[in-house]
């Protein structure tokens, strides 16, 4: 297997957005492949038995990191467990892998090998989350903000406004995905980024000049921009009704003067740090247990793949034998009018054996014993 990947560790989110794969075009060009794309990760998985032209892949994915073989497989198992995520142990990636895999299967773009790898990755991700505590507690400022809002005020059937669609806003979005929220609105100065994030949340994007209307509509407001100036000032929040505002931006998005309004509860990043730091440490302590699961399941996967390889070799060999049998039988049928049956059968059996022996000898002359034992010589001997 080969993986091409680009993620938040190497590129900022605006750059990743420009690197996103056009999946319609991708699946038209390649077979035996699966694309997994999220707001902070772009990855494509290839079965290299089918996609043997690696130069073509490398040219199409300039700027992407490349992983092959064992490294690619281990990487994918870690991804499914949330070990490679912006939020350690996050749950959303497992659902995104399932959705991506299902799409590729519906398009008939997977292979028997990729089916085994993806089903195993999904199983490993499920084990990690049920047998360890890798996904428990809020570990980012973004998820801590959502946890605080839910714990103190409840989010069920609430309207939430997220101001900011950058890195921190994305973390908030990931946490919101798990909640039963009535509606989510995303506002950002760059409307296209708001639109992209809103789509993932199944929410609605608004232009910044419609911020006042969005505030009036919302029950909870989470501010997470990178603006050097206040986004919400006291005069912006006059007569807006009861609001919960959680400001996790640095520098601050909300003027502290809004605390003067009795109908507004304002929380800042300082209220959340202790929550996220403590939970992150708990998750880090679970990493060895998850790695043990990955090691166990990797060994199981390799045995499954070895079985698949043997079955494919036997299938190819049977096809090879059938091809020779058919050709020699055609010759025998042509001779049936001029020779007796015993002579025809004698010639047929000798020709059949000679063809197999000839192909094997021709290939083995210049092949080492080890390579010969590991090769499908009948393919090369044709």
Curated annotation (Swiss-Prot):
GO molecular-function term, one example from the UniProt record: glutamyl-tRNA reductase activity
The organism's place on the tree of life at top rank: Archaea
Pfam families in UniProt: GlutR_dimer, GlutR_N, Shikimate_DH
Documented EC number(s): 1.2.1.70
Keywords annotated in UniProt: NADP, Oxidoreductase, Porphyrin biosynthesis
Reaction it catalyzes: (S)-4-amino-5-oxopentanoate + tRNA(Glu) + NADP(+) = L-glutamyl-tRNA(Glu) + NADPH + H(+)
Catalytic residue positions: 39 (nucleophile)
BP GO terms, sorted: protoporphyrinogen IX biosynthetic process from glutamate
InterPro entries on file: 4pyrrol_synth_GluRdtase (IPR000343), 4pyrrol_synth_GluRdtase_dimer (IPR015896), 4pyrrol_synth_GluRdtase_N (IPR015895), GluRdtase_CS (IPR018214), GluRdtase_dimer_dom_sf (IPR036453), GluRdtase_N_sf (IPR036343), NAD(P)-bd_dom_sf (IPR036291), Shikm_DH/Glu-tRNA_Rdtase (IPR006151)
Site location (Important for activity): 75
Broad class of enzyme this protein falls into: oxidoreductase
Pathway noted in the entry: Porphyrin-containing compound metabolism; protoporphyrin-IX biosynthesis; 5-aminolevulinate from L-glutamyl-tRNA(Glu): step 1/2
PROSITE patterns for the chain: GLUTR
Binding site for substrate: 38-41, 85, 90-92, 96
SUPFAM superfamilies, per database record: Glutamyl tRNA-reductase catalytic, N-terminal domain, Glutamyl tRNA-reductase dimerization domain, NAD(P)-binding Rossmann-fold domains
Binding site for NADP(+): 164-169
Subunit structure: Homodimer.
Domain observations: Possesses an unusual extended V-shaped dimeric structure with each monomer consisting of three distinct domains arranged along a curved 'spinal' alpha-helix. The N-terminal catalytic domain specifically recognizes the glutamate moiety of the substrate. The second domain is the NADPH-binding domain, and the third C-terminal domain is responsible for dimerization.
Function of the molecule: Catalyzes the NADPH-dependent reduction of glutamyl-tRNA(Glu) to glutamate 1-semialdehyde (GSA).
Database matches in PANTHER family: GLUTAMYL-TRNA REDUCTASE
Other comments on record: During catalysis, the active site Cys acts as a nucleophile attacking the alpha-carbonyl group of tRNA-bound glutamate with the formation of a thioester intermediate between enzyme and glutamate, and the concomitant release of tRNA(Glu). The thioester intermediate is finally reduced by direct hydride transfer from NADPH, to form the product GSA.
Assigned protein family: Belongs to the glutamyl-tRNA reductase family.
The name this protein goes by in its record: Glutamyl-tRNA reductase
Organism the protein comes from: Methanococcus maripaludis (strain DSM 14266 / JCM 13030 / NBRC 101832 / S2 / LL)
């Amino acid at each position: 297997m080969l993986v091409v990947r680009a993620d938040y560790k190497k590129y900022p989110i605006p750059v990743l957005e420009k690197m996103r794969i056009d999946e319609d075009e991708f699946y038209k060009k390649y077979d035996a492949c699966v694309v997994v794309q999220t707001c902070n990760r772009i990855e494509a998985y290839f079965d290299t038995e089918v996609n043997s032209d690696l130069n073509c892949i490398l040219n199409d994915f300039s700027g992407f990191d490349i992983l092959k073989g064992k490294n690619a497989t281990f990487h994918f198992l870690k991804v499914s467990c949330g070990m490679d995520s912006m939020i350690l142990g996050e749950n959303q990636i497992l659902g995104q892998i399932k959705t991506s895999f299902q799409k590729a299967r519906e398009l008939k773009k997977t292979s028997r090998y990729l089916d085994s790898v993806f089903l195993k990755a999904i199983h490993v991700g499920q084990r990690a989350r049920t047998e360890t505590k890798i996904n428990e507690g809020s570990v980012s400022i973004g998820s801590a903000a959502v946890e605080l809002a839910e714990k103190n005020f409840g989010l069920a059937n609430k309207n939430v406004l997220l101001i900011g669609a950058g890195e921190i806003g994305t973390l908030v979005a990931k946490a919101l995905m798990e909640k039963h929220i009535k509606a989510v609105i995303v506002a950002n100065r760059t409307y296209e980024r708001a639109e992209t994030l809103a789509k993932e949340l199944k929410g609605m994007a608004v232009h910044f000049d419609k911020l006042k209307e969005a505030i009036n509509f919302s029950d909870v407001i989470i501010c997470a921009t990178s603006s050097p100036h206040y986004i919400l000032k006291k005069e912006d929040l006059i007569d807006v009704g009861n609001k919960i505002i959680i400001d996790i931006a640095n520098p601050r998005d909300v003027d502290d003067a809004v605390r003067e309004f009795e109908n507004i509860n304002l929380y800042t990043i300082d209220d959340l740090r202790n929550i996220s730091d403590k939970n992150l440490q708990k998750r880090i302590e679970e990493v060895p247990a998850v790695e043990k699961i990955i090691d166990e399941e990797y060994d199981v996967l390799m045995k499954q793949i070895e079985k698949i390889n043997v079955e494919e070799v036997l299938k190819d060999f049977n096809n090879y034998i059938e091809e020779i049998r058919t050709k020699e039988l055609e010759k025998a049928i042509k001779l049936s009018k001029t020779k007796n049956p015993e002579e025809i059968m004698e010639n047929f059996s000798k020709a059949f054996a000679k063809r197999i022996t000839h192909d094997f000898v021709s290939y083995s002359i210049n092949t080492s014993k080890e390579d010969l034992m590991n090769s499908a010589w009948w393919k090369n001997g044709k």
